[in-house]
Amino acid sequence: VAIEASNDDWSLAPFALAGQNAIVTGAGSGIGQATAKLLASVGAKVVVTDLVPDSARRVTEQIIAAGGEAIAVACDVSNESQVVEAFERADDWFGPLDVLVNVAAYRKKHETLTMSVEQWDIMHAVIGRGTYLCIRNAVPRMRDSGRGGSIVNVSSVAAERPVVFDSIDYDSAKAGVNAITRAAAAEFAQYGIRVNAVMPGATNRPGAPDLGGVRPTGPFTMPGRMPMKRIAEPIEQARAVLFLASPAASYISGVCIPVDGAGLLS
């Protein structure tokens, strides 16, 4: 499949997703929620999947209220049968799949020497296996449609430079996502399918302490350690996802882009 760009198109239209169909995993909160809303706002029909059914429904209702199109599907991405069912729901609702965004993850601090094998397996099942299962279900649909497609995985800067705030199971699972991204990009480029990753740095998220609108800025706080002296907001990660998912990035594949305010350089 050859997906070609036009040198005569100087508009911003390639940054939109009008007429495209997308699945976003882990879309019930945080980066996933911001991504689902943003993709819908630029014209995509979005399947909002999340482990928590109420979260998926809430985000879907917000998208519809804003004039977008979405359906909610509960899905544990580490469970093969649930992933298959989610993609079949998408088939029934919108037909050909154009965009897959793998955001679903699991994060819990574990000490290396006391972590159980079960805890290790859970982390890798959600992040590694979940990413693989979704790609395995997306690629045949994108290939067979003749339209190609775009897959964006949400990894982490921890895949490149682990920090004390993370743990070995999370860091290694995210490093695996980067490897999956590059391998899949090489394997599926022949079908017009692009595969990229966004590597968020520290990002405001559900469950973060309520600071009453005040962000700590001292040198020993997370924002204070960042070159930009703040952490990212979910929408800033979602905008990077949108760019990679959109036709504007039509010749970009196999890259893992840090969105961390120069954090990896500090």
Model-derived segments and spans:
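Short C-terminal tail/terminal secondary-structure segment
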Residues: 2-13, 161, 241-242, 253-266
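Active-site helix of classical SDR
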Residues: 135, 173, 181
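Alpha-helical segment proximal to the catalytic Tyr-Lys
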Residues: 140, 186-187, 250
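Residue(s) in the substrate-gating loop at a strand-loop-helix junction
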Residues: 156
